Structure formats: structure tokens, C-alpha cells
């Protein structure tokens, strides 16, 4: 992998990740852009203890432009985009309309491919590995920013999810705090460790799932299953079999196997609802250990956390979506219409032949 860092016309960072070591990236952003002014602010809820990012400038962000005006496609002639070069393998840049900025963190856009009409599932294993390497490098770089405590790599896919750009891409949020979801896992981890005399909860969950009937896919270094208490109609958790706290901890064997396993999962998701159905909308979310101090979680260290990817769709059946209504939105109690055992069975049924 070759990495080339440059700047866009308004000063935002752009990083190219290339498969070939001899690739030259010297194109200049010719757009007359002024420096981005953001209004990102993080406010803490005194009752719930969680945080809300207030970012009113995002109301003016680009919304479903036609393909020939896509800001994530390479620049061609007089059609200038966020990517100044006429081609790229993987490109990452600071979001022009960030939810988090300055002391409130940082937001980046990850372009998986220059092919506007592709999806992650269409990538070659070599290209998917390059995306993994880009995620890993950005996790490392962002973790060193003084305001950053946790790095979150994710992909929203599909208009039903709320995606505003059709080009295949993901995002990275670098938070200035430990997120509430991660804090819950760390508290459970600490309680289990204390109650069992040191047993790791992630290890116990993975062992139990691998011995059960909700396994979807298992390789030499990765395992995917539908969790016992899945929140979503079709939800899969993908774990490396060797526990590591973040993407940086993956060894070469796990990195090599990841593309094959992950691409197969994504392709199965597109087959869940049968032939003739539109692509399945999904969210893919990497859970990594925070880089900040963990004194709040007694007895827990970063190495106790287990890196894993959560992949789920909000489509519960053909033509119908799972909405977060009263119980979910008001009380945070999920109602799942699809038994996890049936979801796992269906995901095994649609395996590639």
C-alpha cells in the first residue's frame, strides 16, 4: 500500500491509498473554495449522561446530486470534485460538513472505489483489503489527535438508511469522549470480570455463540453470528477469533482472510429477501476500544476489549422497514420481528455456491 497525503483548496486533508507503490498523486484542487466554517458543538445531557453533537451547518450539505455531479467521483476536465485526481483506489478526506470538528473531534469520508455504480460487495478482495488498511491507518492517525478518545469507522448503505450520496463510501468519526454504547460494553465487561474472578466477557460470548445454532459464517481467523439478543431483523456480529482491542491489533493472517469473509457476508445480505429485490440497506459499524483512560471501568484495560464489526439492516421483510418507534426511541427497548435463530438460518441458506 502507498499512502499520499495532500490538501484540498480549503485546507482539508486528503489521503490517497494506492495498491501500486509507484503511483504518483500530484493533482491540485482547482476549486475556488473558502475555508470551511463549522458550528459543531458537543452538549452533554445532565439526566442521561450522554452527549449530543449540534451541527447546524450540516443542513446545507450536498443531497442526492445526479451521478455526473457526484463529489466523490474523480475530477474529470472541468468537472471538479472532492478528489482532484482523475482516478483513485481508495481516498479519505475531511468531511466538508462535519458533525464533529476542532475540539469536538473530527469526521472523515472514506471512498471505497472510484466506480460510482459499485458497492462494497462488488469490490475485489484486493480492493477490500486496501479499505481495511486505510481504516487501520486512519484509526492510528486520528488516535494521536489531542481531542480524540475513540475512533469509529462505519458505512451507511442505502437511501432508507439516510445516505445522501450514492457513491460507495463510508465515514470515520473521531469522538472526544467514549461513546455511550462502548461505555455500556465496558461496564458489562468490568462486572463480568469481577464476578468471575477475571473471565473475559467477550471471550465467553464468542465461545457460546460458536457452540450454538446462530453461526452464519466461520473462517480460520474470523467468525460471524447472529447474537442471542439481536436488536435488528437481520444483524450479524463479525469477530476475529484472536481477541484484539482495535484494527491495529489484527495480524497479517486475519487481515488476509478478512476480505473473503466480509465480502461473502455483504453478498448474502443482498440475497436475504430473494431475487428481484433492491439492494439491502445496511449499517456496518466497527467497535474499537477507546484510546482514553478507562479508570471509570474498574479492572478493565484496553486489551480486554474485543474488536468486532456489527452489520445490520433495517429491512425486516420485502418492502417493509423496521422503524424505531415508541418503545425503541422512547425507552430504548427494541422489538425484533425476526427470531435470531431464523435470521441465522436464512443467512446460511443464501451462501454463495
Stretches with model-predicted labels:
Residues 1-353:
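HIT superfamily nucleotide-processing domains
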Amino acid at each position: 500500500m502507498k499512502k499520499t497525503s495532500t490538501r484540498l483548496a480549503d485546507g482539508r486533508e486528503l489521503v490517497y491509498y494506492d495498491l501500486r507503490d509507484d503511483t504518483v498523486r500530484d493533482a491540485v484542487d482547482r476549486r475556488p473554495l473558502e475555508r470551511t466554517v463549522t458550528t459543531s458543538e458537543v452538549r452533554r445531557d445532565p439526566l442521561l449522561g450522554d452527549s449530543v453533537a449540534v451541527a447546524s451547518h450540516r443542513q446545507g450539505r450536498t443531497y442526492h446530486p445526479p451521478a455526473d455531479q457526484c463529489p466523490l467521483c474523480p475530477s474529470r476536465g472541468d468537472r471538479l470534485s472532492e478528489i482532484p485526481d482523475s482516478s483513485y483506489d481508495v481516498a479519505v478526506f475531511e468531511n466538508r460538513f462535519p458533525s464533529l470538528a476542532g475540539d469536538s473531534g473530527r469526521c472523515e469520508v472514506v471512498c471505497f472505489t472510484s466506480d460510482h455504480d459499485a458497492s462494497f460487495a462488488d469490490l475485489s478482495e484486493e480492493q477490500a483489503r486496501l479499505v481495511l488498511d486505510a481504516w487501520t491507518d486512519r484509526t492510528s492517525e486520528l488516535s494521536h489527535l489531542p481531542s480524540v478518545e475513540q475512533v469509529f469507522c462505519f458505512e451507511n448503505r442505502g437511501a432508507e438508511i439516510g445516505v445522501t450520496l450514492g457513491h460507495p463510501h463510508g465515514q470515520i468519526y473521531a469522538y472526544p469522549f467514549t461513546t455511550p454504547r462502548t461505555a455500556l460494553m465496558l461496564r458489562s465487561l468490568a462486572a463480568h470480570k469481577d464476578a468471575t474472578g477475571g473471565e473475559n466477557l467477550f471471550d465467553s460470548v464468542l465461545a457460546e455463540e460458536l457452540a450454538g445454532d446462530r453461526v452464519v459464517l466461520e473462517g480460520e481467523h474470523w467468525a460471524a453470528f447472529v447474537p442471542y439478543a439481536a436488536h435488528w431483523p437481520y444483524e450479524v456480529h463479525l469477530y476475529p477469533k484472536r481477541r484484539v482491542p482495535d484494527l491495529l491489533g489484527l495480524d497479517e493472517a486475519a487481515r488476509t482472510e478478512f476480505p473473503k469473509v466480509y465480502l461473502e457476508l455483504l453478498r448474502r445480505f443482498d440475497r436475504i429477501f430473494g431475487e428481484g429485490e433492491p439492494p439491502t440497506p445496511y449499517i456496518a459499524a466497527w467497535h474499537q476500544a477507546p484510546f482514553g483512560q478507562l479508570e471509570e471501568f474498574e479492572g478493565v484495560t484496553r486489551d480486554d476489549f474485543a474488536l468486532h464489526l456489527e452489520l445490520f439492516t433495517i429491512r425486516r421483510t420485502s418492502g417493509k422497514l423496521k422503524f424505531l418507534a415508541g418503545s425503541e426511541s422512547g425507552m430504548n427497548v427494541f422489538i425484533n420481528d425476526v427470531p435470531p435463530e431464523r435470521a441465522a438460518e436464512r443467512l446460511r441458506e443464501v451462501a454463495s455456491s
